[in-house]
């Protein structure tokens, strides 16, 4: 495999969730433009597609040469090899009837478009240029012959994702991703595990336990738990404790 750190090609990127889209460009493993953040408009398919085109055009206008490709992550199961997004996507409800997103962007920009699952790409990135080579380098420096080639990576945030790398290769599974977000919630069988470990889970549990009507983010709730912000410390601690408990159940069912 070529060393991506010495590769001079430019790739436009997108980090998307239900609220915002952050557009950028990478070369040699480094971002080369200031990120551009736009509202995702994930509830409206036409607006969402227009936002994607607008964001990538804004990035392209900052580059000194034509980008080689577009590459980005998307949540949930999909036909990633063909660039088709479909299925019950909690974060992007307007995509549930199926959208040929890869072919659409390829036609708009005239370059290859690579889309994959967010959890898979996180794990793949850590396997190529993150924690896995760092561990192997430490082993080499210590004189050990042991080398690791397998990695399981979990991502937390707007949702809950996982990626699996086996012998240096991404395991896409039968649905183009390895997924855990749809496991049942052990405390509330009417919802899925993602509703117990995501950003909205921490916010919901704290609000339910404390009765605090403020619109707080997990960082605020963490500060309450640490005693740095006014609020119910007991409820804040319990919100994160429940997240940790449910995460453990998802990782080791």
Regions found by a protein language model. Name each.
Residues 52-70, 112-113, 211, 250-253:
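Phosphate/pyrophosphate-binding loops at sites that engage ATP/ADP/AMP, CoA/4′-phosphopantetheine
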Residues 30-66, 231:
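N-terminal phosphate-binding loop and adjacent alpha-helix
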Residues 41-50, 66-70, 76-148:
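Glycine-rich phosphate-binding loop and adjoining helix at the ATP-binding site
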Residues 1-8, 14-16:
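N-terminal helix-turn-helix/winged-helix DNA-binding helices
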Residues 75-78, 157-159:
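Short glycine-rich anion-binding loops that position phosphate/pyrophosphate groups of nucleotides
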Residues 6-10, 22-26, 30-37, 45, ...:
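Glycine/GP-enriched mid-protein hinge/lid loop-to-helix segment characteristic of carbohydrate kinases
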Residues 237-244, 248:
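Amphipathic, non-transmembrane alpha-helical scaffold segments
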Residues 10, 17-19, 80-84:
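Interdomain hinge and pocket-entrance segments immediately C-terminal to HTH DNA-binding domains
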């Amino acid at each position: 495999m070529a060393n991506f750190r010495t590769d001079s090609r430019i790739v436009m990127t997108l980090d998307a969730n239900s609220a915002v889209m952050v557009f950028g460009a990478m070369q040699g493993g480094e971002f080369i433009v200031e990120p551009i953040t736009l509202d995702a408009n994930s509830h409206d398919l036409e607006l969402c597609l227009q936002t994607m085109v607008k964001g990538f055009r804004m990035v392209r206008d900052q580059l000194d040469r034509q980008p080689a490709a577009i590459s980005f992550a998307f949540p949930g199961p999909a036909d990633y090899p063909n660039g088709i997004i479909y299925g019950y996507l909690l974060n992007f409800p307007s995509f549930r009837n199926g959208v040929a997103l890869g072919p659409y962007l390829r036609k708009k920009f005239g370059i290859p478009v690579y889309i994959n699952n967010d959890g898979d790409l996180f794990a793949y990135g850590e396997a190529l240029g993150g924690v896995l080579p760092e561990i192997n380098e430490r082993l080499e420096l210590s004189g050990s012959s042991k080398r690791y080639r397998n990695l399981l990576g979990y991502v937390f945030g707007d949702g809950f994702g996982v990626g699996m790398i086996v012998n240096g290769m991404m395991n896409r599974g039968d649905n183009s991703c390895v997924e855990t977000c749809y496991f049942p919630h052990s405390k509330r069988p009417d919802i899925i595990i993602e509703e117990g470990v995501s950003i909205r889970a921490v916010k919901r549990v704290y609000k339910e336990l404390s009765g605090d009507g403020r619109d707080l983010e997990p960082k605020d709730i963490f500060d309450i738990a640490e005693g740095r912000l006014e609020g119910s410390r007991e409820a804040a601690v319990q919100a994160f404790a429940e997240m940790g408990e449910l995460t453990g159940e998802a990782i080791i069912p």
